[in-house]
Amino acid sequence: MNTLSNTITVAVVGGEGIGPEVTDQSHRILKWFSDRRGAPVILREAQYGLIPYLATGKVLPDDTVEAMEEADAILWGATGGPETTEVPPAARKAGSLLSLRSKYDLYANLRPIVANPALADSAPLKAAVLKDVDFIIIRELTSGIYFGEPRGIETLPDGQRRGFNTQQYTTSQIRRVARTAFELARTRKGRVCSVDKANVLETSVLWREEVTALHEAEFSDVELTHLYVDNAAMQIVRAPSQFDVMVTCNIFGDILSDCAAMASGSLGMLPSVSLGPPDRLGRRKALYEPVHGSAPDIAGKGIANPLGSILSVAMMLRITLHRPEDAALLEKAVDTALAAGARTADIAEPGAKRLSTQEMGDAVLNALDKVVGKEREHA
């Protein structure tokens, strides 16, 4: 981290599958803001996956680890794909995204869900349902069933196999992610919906009690509601505009955010950031990445949607670089490109022209130039 200047160092890790393709476009966007808007960014590219494994025996080589350690933020592409079979499980696990989340204690994952009017006809949900949809799902990311021990698969005395996992949470693990939700809600519409399954799970009983206690003690000015996860999934599809900030545990957040992606038209549209605890100066380690996976079926074809990665840059501009005007500018440019008909295959209507990954990046860059030009005309 740069402790003596305002310059932000960003480690750019394309990863696997479509990761490098979409990250190439968000890299171009960051460079535009550095060159044209004076954003104080140093970009440092690094490798992850099969290629560095074949060269070094590690999917996460030492120079990539060094780049991420020194970075204020990480721009991540994707992990996984057929090539994972060429990497031994132990090596893959040692450099997994789960291990990175744990290493940097990236406990709060923020996933904005915004329904763009330009995509109303291509989204799976009805246009009337999508009107005014703009909320954020905050997923606890470093605890819960994905990290709980004991876990495993064993053979029982009668020959049957049994798989088991452990779901567990502590007061501090719940309260710190709930605090993130309440603080964010204060900057938005002032509403938090906490999602659990407290009617059957003890971890959810504790979750609800701790979220409620924190609310009563420090955030009584924020409206708090609770939903069971099954009802929350239904409400996201039925009336997503009712939500402002939703906070939930790891596994529920994983599922609900993919469900909510349909309000945006495609997983390819969704950005995210995973935040660590603030240091004494209030700075937080942050990993920015699109929500989509590595999509090995289309990797290398140049047709992936880069907007989830590009909009992750908008989140970076707002959260890490503290440049909300530039974040809004980028979001407006994406809106402008979409309104002009720019579409990759995943968001294109039948018969519509389909842009390549590179062409969509070009469309956003052209829109940035136009938006800035109009701002100067009216200055």
Curated annotation (Swiss-Prot):
* Binding-site list for NAD(+): 293-305
Transmembrane region positions? none
Look up the record and name the cofactor or cofactors this protein needs. Answer: Mg(2+); Mn(2+)
**Gene3D superfamilies found in the cross-reference section:** Isopropylmalate Dehydrogenase (3.40.718.10)
Identify one Gene Ontology CC term for this UniProt entry.
cytosol
Cofactor binding description? Binds 1 Mg(2+) or Mn(2+) ion per subunit.
Question: What residues does Mg(2+) bind to?
Answer: 230, 254, 258
What keyword terms does UniProt attach to this protein?
Amino-acid biosynthesis, Branched-chain amino acid biosynthesis, Cytoplasm, Leucine biosynthesis, Magnesium, Manganese, Metal-binding, NAD, Oxidoreductase
The GO molecular function terms of this record are:
3-isopropylmalate dehydrogenase activity; magnesium ion binding; NAD binding
Protein purpose: Catalyzes the oxidation of 3-carboxy-2-hydroxy-4-methylpentanoate (3-isopropylmalate) to 3-carboxy-4-methyl-2-oxopentanoate. The product decarboxylates to 4-methyl-2 oxopentanoate.
Q: Which family does the similarity line name? A: Belongs to the isocitrate and isopropylmalate dehydrogenases family. LeuB type 1 subfamily.
Subunit organization: Homodimer.
User: What is the name listed in the Swiss-Prot or TrEMBL entry for this protein?
Assistant: 3-isopropylmalate dehydrogenase 1
